[in-house]
Amino acid sequence: MRNKLSFDLQLSARKAAIAERIAAHKIARSKVSVFLMAMSAGVFMAIGFTFYLSVIADAPSSQALTHLVGGLCFTLGFILLAVCGTSLFTSSVMTVMAKSRGVIGWRTWLINALLVACGNLAGIACFSLLIWFSGLVMSENAMWGVAFLHCAEGKMHHTFTESVSLGIMCNLMVCLALWMSYCGRSLCDKIVAMILPITLFVASGFEHCIANLFVIPFAIAIRHFAPTSFWQLAHSSADNFPALTVSHFITANLLPVMLGNIIGGAVLVSICYRAIYLRQEP
């Protein structure tokens, strides 16, 4: 009887062809379908970050093991993305392969990317409301909410260059994880291939614009709308988190990180690998 367990992997050129076909297929979907799938992706990312934060909320931030375990927990969000076939902005930038092939123009690519980003934001907003009304912010004597605040505050003090660089490295890992998942022939293969790259980016503190769309606006909401009882339990005050404002988030984090994510995914993975494996020889 043939053993079904196998380490048989797709060849690199085969992976590139698969990635190109997936990119073209994503672009060809209806706008409603793209938006709904992007909403699901936003929810999954928020779920992954909620798992991550629930694990590290009461742990010392200096412990390497805490970062490792937190990173492993965060991979849940990406596993859900891979299994359910949704559209995340940072991985959808790989659809630039379809542009390189000449299937679409830049306008179509840009509209698709913006639609996915808006869908991700809508999904995150829906899940954030559930988290807010669930009372989790007050759990563990408000430690859960305080962890959100400290995590978000720490993301707001990078320089522009640092934020872009962290964004590049983050989406390099995310898109390589996705690329590696194309190697696998089974669900287990795909999941295992994704775990370490995602864990690395989380444990190393790289910046992901869609994850930040969940954690930082939610932390801003806590800072402005949390009841007095929250601050009493936390033995803190809103004044201890001055960087958590909408304008500062957009200029100091969201825009530079998004730029870095686009460079990391579209240029360093999609365009480079297409040039290596699918470029037509003269």
What positions do the PLM features span?
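Alpha-helical transmembrane segments and their helix-helix packing motifs
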Residues: 1-282
